[in-house]
């Protein structure tokens, strides 16, 4: 179902609901491509067909924006590639390396003060290094590239979570199982427990 109705202000926006305006995601995408759009938003890439159509649309020069139920940029890339049969995966890696521009991943974590949740976000912008990793089937190294690419405005999930803990928004107990880099987790643990007041400090001896 359509969850948000976008108001057309400086552009023509057409929204299609699966089951009402089109029978499937694939048919909806094919119909959209015939209208020569500038931007295509796919609510969620659920299956091989929708992923294949989205990649094909991106290859023709369209900006394609979509969502997936993943927790990191590397996991997103892996999910797309692994959705295809093994004999197609080299081709998909090549397509993805050429067309993917960015991945924003989000985790909603419980706030330390109990007032709802706060978002930790990872930002990956595809540069030459990440293109090569995708093409060469070395997706597992993407997280390390993100962590060392601050000049390219990237931010790893580990660093995003660390910022939330340092600001007092998320507890270390909530954060520590989510870390990819064990050294960063250990460094954060030392800071957190060094900053905490010692039991009985300042009392009589």
Range-by-range predicted roles:
Residues 1-205:
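Short, flexible helix-loop junctions that flank or precede catalytic/ligand sites
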